[in-house]
């Protein structure tokens, strides 16, 4: 199957670009994920910093894209340049399986579009649109792999909420006895994913960095992210420290983070009718995927998670996470449990449930989410 995909992708590129060389390998890959989600939410009481909310419970049920993993297709290529050096590229496009629409702001390759060089001894350099270091290093520590709707670790740790930047130069070292580091700089984040996203002429910049250790059953990661906006505006920043240990029968995950002066990517809790006052400093917090700054905002974040295999085809996982803000905002607690069942090596069923109390940092906001779905990788 992999050989067929590689040959097919190579034939496509050869037809587009001319001669294909034997030392070049191109792989076509992807996955499709779609499910059904039920949500029941209660919009909380009035908050002086966020505007007026109602107090009724509301619910809905419908088809949802990418509960476990965002649907995508991509091309991954490498060319051997000799002496351990290779040219590499990744072009990855996100889409919604329920309607066929493009994701990531209707970009053609919104998930990733990079070209770079990789050396066996000196590491890898990538240029283009890609995720930050935190989203790379904590995907294996979070029991929910930074996915599954509100169950993602990114709900409480916004710098790990699959943050993507345009115009990024990123260097990652090779693994030295299990240790690896990385640093990236975006010359213009150019975010267009939300209605208040960054415009190109804003020239907002960002830095992302981290180190991790992966050895046997132990994983440890530390990351730091900061965004640089106009000099008169706050500069959001967050560090995250996390670890996971696999006891074979159970994998335990722990993380702590601290955010200052804003949110990198807010989780969309979709409070079904609760409208944030657009004139308040906290606009967009929790209800959209927008980034925002708020001078003096501080949020301490915590995660405790577990995962365990059941037989040879099933896994169960759970987590508790808390985001504890200042500014008189409400603590947010999220309790989650998930389950996967492998039908084959490439196809699986899944189920997930989560309960958020104090969602979007507002007293009385409650959100229950239950989803089931099917994922196929190719």
Q: Where do the language-model regions lie?
A:
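Transmembrane beta-barrel strands of outer-membrane/channel proteins
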Residues: 32-36, 91-93, 129, 183-185, ...
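Repeated loop/turn-to-beta-strand initiation elements of outer-membrane beta-barrel proteins
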Residues: 85-87, 121-125, 178-181, 217-222, ...
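Gram-negative bacterial Sec-dependent N-terminal signal peptides
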Residues: 1-22
């Amino acid at each position: 199957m992999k050989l067929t995909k590689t040959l097919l992708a190579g034939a496509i590129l050869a037809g587009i670009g001319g001669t294909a060389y034997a030392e070049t390998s191109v792989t076509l890959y992807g996955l499709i994920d779609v499910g059904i989600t039920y949500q029941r939410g209660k919009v909380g009481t009035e908050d002086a910093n966020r505007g007026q909310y109602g107090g009724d419970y509301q619910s809905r049920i419908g088809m949802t894209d990418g509960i476990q993993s965002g649907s995508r297709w991509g091309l991954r290529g490498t060319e051997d340049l000799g002496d351990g050096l290779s040219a590499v590229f990744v072009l990855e496009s996100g889409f919604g399986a329920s309607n066929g629409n493009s994701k990531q702001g209707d970009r053609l390759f919104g998930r990733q579009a990079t070209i770079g060089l990789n050396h066996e001894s000196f590491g890898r350099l990538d240029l283009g649109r890609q995720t930050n270091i935190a989203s790379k290093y904590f995907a294996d520590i979070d029991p929910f792999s930074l996915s599954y709707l509100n169950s993602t670790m990114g709900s409480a740790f916004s710098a790990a909420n699959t943050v993507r930047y345009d115009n990024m130069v990123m260097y990652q070292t090779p693994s030295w006895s299990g240790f690896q580091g990385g640093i990236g700089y975006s010359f213009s984040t150019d975010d267009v994913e939300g209605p208040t996203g960054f415009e190109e002429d804003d020239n907002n910049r960002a830095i992302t960095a981290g180190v991790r250790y992966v050895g046997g059953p132990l994983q440890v990661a530390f990351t730091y992210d900061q965004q640089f906006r106009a000099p008169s505006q706050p500069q959001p920043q967050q560090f995250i420290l996390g670890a996971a240990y696999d006891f074979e029968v159970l994998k335990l995950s722990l993380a702590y983070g601290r955010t200052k002066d804003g949110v990198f990517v807010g989780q969309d809790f979709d409070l079904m009718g609760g409208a944030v006052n657009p004139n308040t400093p906290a606009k967009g917090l929790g209800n959209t995927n927008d980034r925002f700054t708020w001078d003096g905002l501080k949020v301490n974040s915590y995660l405790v998670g577990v995962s365990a295999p059941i037989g040879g085809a099933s896994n169960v996982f759970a987590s508790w996470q808390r985001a504890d803000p200042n500014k008189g905002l409400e603590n947010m607690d999220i309790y989650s449990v998930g389950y996967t069942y492998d039908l084959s090596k490439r196809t699986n069923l899944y189920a997930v449930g989560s309960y958020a109390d104090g969602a979007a940092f507002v007293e009385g906001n409650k959100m229950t989410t239950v989803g089931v779905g099917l994922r196929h990788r190719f």
